[in-house]
Amino acid sequence: MTDLTAQDAAWSTRDHLDDPVIGELRNRFGPDAFTVQATRTGIPVVWVKREQLLEVGDFLKKLPKPYVMLFDLHGMDERLRTHRDGLPAADFSVFYHLISIERNRDIMLKVALSENDLRVPTFTKLFPNANWYERETWEMFGIDIEGHPHLTRIMMPQTWEGHPLRKDYPARATEFDPFELTKAKQDLEMEALTFKPEDWGMKRGTDNEDFMFLNLGPNHPSAHGAFRIILQLDGEEIVDCVPDIGYHHRGAEKMGERQSWHSYIPYTDRIEYLGGCVNEMPYVLAVEKLAGITVPDRVNVIRVMLSELFRINSHLLYISTFIQDVGAMTPVFFAFTDRQKIYDLVEAITGFRMHPAWFRIGGVAHDLPRGWDRLLREFLEWMPKRLDSYEKAALRNTILKGRSQGVAAYGAKEALEWGTTGAGLRATGIDFDVRKWRPYSGYENFDFEVPVGGGVSDCYTRVMLKVEELRQSLRILQQCLDNMPEGPFKADHPLTTPPPKERTLQHIETLITHFLQVSWGPVMPAQESFQMVEATKGINSYYLTSDGSTMSYRTRVRTPSFAHLQQIPSAIRGSLVSDLIVYLGSIDFVMSDVDR
């Protein structure tokens, strides 16, 4: 325990005290207006009174270097949390995570709520993208959002009963009664899926004509998954639309409360099922912040290498399916040939293809195999020429450019308002890539550029930025090949999981530690941590709350695709149905990333 205590002290943070925004808030609202919470999130966490929430949010949004993006918003059931020293009394809480691009800093506002008075004012008056986040917060916790434009379920069926992320809500199927779909239940479910325009503030027609309401999905090839959009059409023109998500929801955050810190790693792969190890990175880094683990240089470079391989793999599928959505079939078959080479390389290193679950708390599952460098070198010799052929043969085609240039275009202001990240944000001219601005896993040691657009994000610009991102990922991989450090593939730390196997043969204490951490799970200090990464589709993050147990008290997964789909109506109104198909192809999303 002595080693753990020393490590714990080394990881104490002063971000909550040193950030200038704390002084700005105290100057405006008084020194005693807030409770500042010490965490390992790396950002200031400030508890505000419910009555001051909108005023504080408006103040932050209007600062000289403003907090212009609502990055995340969600809740927590605090009733069973035992380690709450120094925090306001709360049965539930709601948090608001804001980002300032100019400062390259974040702030998290928290509101404490009593079980007898579960309500907060809507944040949509300040940030329109709060809409979906508030709907999910109400759905999962039963917290009323006063003034919300349409407070209804978003992940679960409209007929669902209860609030799944409450601590008293069952987490296992065996805790429910057996499911029976009677004729009456089936009729009720079908009725719940019937779209009523009036519920969404839409008119069925004007004095001269009626609008047509069309279901696109949830089983449409251009919807890219189980995704439904209800279109209000005047001929071919889209007057308005309502995205309908949740068909792929699997309760990933609830699962985090029933799995050990170690056994949850495979679930992260399936949040965005094309991203593989990219999904594991923010979770493992957040857990390592809780544990106070610093990994060896070799681990950092291996993690970067696997992440960039999966980034290339995902981008190739995105680019080829976008071209297919526009009408060209051939490139998608070429792309699958190239992706197979990546899968061969990933399988040789990890033993798996799509979902390796290979990162570990404190390292990776095992060291690189013999011959990994030869396979990577062959891929790096192959891929650049293929990228040139994609660009020359398909992406510079005049028909494709005509279908995508100027379509679903938006500027920096709209991107920030809707929480857009990744290529969609950078296409507007905002240079914000987490690997550069907030480097993690040693990205600061790599030489690469961040492709940025000219001020307007349209379908064509978003795709072309991804092509250039592919080239930069190849550049990073070359540096991994040339500069792979020697050293261990796991950190020498008591909470590294699983511990090195060879130590079990030395002493009974190490054998007991190994047995407990593998079977029961490591016990993490009671703290909060946060990690964001530049994932394949935008910024992905994990916000973890530990109550000093073998399992997470609260696992919040923020995915980019959720924010990007909420933006669809704003970007596509006034366009044609054919433009919507191109727009959907240019977003780069998968529904598991949306629905979790």
From Swiss-Prot:
Keyword Membrane on entry: yes
EC category name: translocase
Gene3D superfamilies found in the cross-reference section: Cytochrome-c3 Hydrogenase, chain B (1.10.645.10), NADH:ubiquinone oxidoreductase, 30kDa subunit (3.30.460.80)
A matching Pfam family: Complex1_49kDa
Membrane topology category: Peripheral membrane protein
Keywords: Cell inner membrane, Cell membrane, Membrane, Multifunctional enzyme, NAD, Quinone, Translocase, Transport, Ubiquinone
Family: In the N-terminal section; belongs to the complex I 30 kDa subunit family. In the C-terminal section; belongs to the complex I 49 kDa subunit family.
Assembly information from the UniProt record: NDH-1 is composed of 13 different subunits. Subunits NuoB, CD, E, F, and G constitute the peripheral sector of the complex.
The protein, known as: NADH-quinone oxidoreductase subunit C/D
Species of provenance: Salmonella typhimurium (strain LT2 / SGSC1412 / ATCC 700720)
